[in-house]
Amino acid sequence: VTLFPRLVAALHIARARRALLVPMLGTFVLASACDPAPAVGDGPYAKLLGRAIPKVEEATGLTFKTTPVIATRSRDEVREFLLKQLTSERAATQLAAQERVYKLLGLVPKDADLNPLLRRLLEEQIVGYYDPATKTLYVVEDVKPEILELTVTHELVHALQDQYVNIDSIQAQVGDADRQLAAQAILEGQAVYAQLRASMGETSLRMGGWQRARVAMRDAQEGMPVFSNAPMVVRESLLFPYVGGADFVFRFTQRRPGVDVLQDMPVSSRQLLSDAAYFGRGDSVVAPDARDYPAPVTLPAPSKGRVVASNTFGEFETRLIVFEYIPNELAAGRAAQGVDGDRWALVELPQGDALVWASVWDNAVEAAEFVDQFTEWLRKRHPRIGSRDAIDAPTRTWYAPADSAKGRAARSVIVHVETRGTRPLVVITDAPYGQAAGLIDPARIVIDD
């Protein structure tokens, strides 16, 4: 989830390069040594920049407007910079709310603390980063030459991107996590794609190299003990900008050769995951105004309690929610496919936290698939849950008794389905026992088409 998109590079890609991309990019490193390029500048990284810049420009189709700056920092200095971002007021508030939502949905253990987990991930992963505020690429001192080359190559792409789009403004977006995830996936995905293209060549990528790289990226987590033992939702959210983002960029270059993806970025995880949502159906590419955009959903104020946070899940995070208790990729994919906009709110009540989640769907079939899978999800999440309402009732109220062995209090869950115009609206209210009824009025939910 992409809670702090700029941290993701430091958290994951460094070690992933070590375990995955070093062997794959060996030809790039060797070729660099055999075919020296003119140095860029006169600093300690002049030769490295001379080798890497042309390859990055060729792989992205963009040229540097100004020469990038590289500086060395100690591991402690890099850690301090990243931890400052992690503990900033905005980041801390966002992380705390996300943690409460994840606990309510059973995506992380009740006693989990995501802040120290991210700190440990930082300590495991730090190699380098690009800071858009200072326009400088920082690398950790005493890094092995092959790791340095790969780190610089990846982060040079971010430096190049920052000369064409405002990375700072992308990172500062709030209130629509799904859109922020889509943007971050393009930034990280283009960097991964550029690395692979620089090392393997475009032909190799198209002839199965990309599929092998995808598998290798996932296998690489075996060498990252902190990462591999993190909750599934954390692992997948950190991986997605790299794997899912690079996968989209790979498809984009095939469907729209010569076009700059930074100037026409997807705005939702659905557009990343579904060719039809972004490119359109068939071989031709639809105009931007003909794409499938998520409908903004606005929730009314709850009848009681206080809204702590409100955001979006989108298709990708909806998949993760379902997958946690129904570990079948096809089932989770079908459940989330067709979501056309959503909004959740975390409501703080005296009895405990409640979650209100409204989602609009393309059609009744896809909404029914989601409701069916979510019903199964409820049974897996709360084995003793039950409902007296008919299976096909538009509103079903579920009661989950307390489970002292697992430290769970009794819960009430309401699943409500209605039609707005031609599209179904699904409203889920998960609250402490007896508090779900009337917490939100579905009739006051606004869908902006």
Please give the residue ranges for each predicted region:
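C-terminal motif of bacterial Sec signal peptides marking the signal peptidase cleavage site
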Residues: 30-33
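Bacterial signal peptide processing site
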Residues: 35-37
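Active-site recognition of the HExxH zinc-binding catalytic motif
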Residues: 56, 150-167, 191-192
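Pan-zinc metallopeptidase signature
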Residues: 59, 224-352, 358, 366
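Catalytic zinc-binding patch centered on the HExxH motif and its immediate surroundings
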Residues: 80-92, 113-134
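Short pre-active-site segment immediately N-terminal to the catalytic Zn-binding motif
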Residues: 137-152, 182-183
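Post-HExxH zinc-binding segment in Zn-dependent metallohydrolases
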Residues: 162-168, 172-219
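C-terminal soluble interaction/assembly domains
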Residues: 340-449
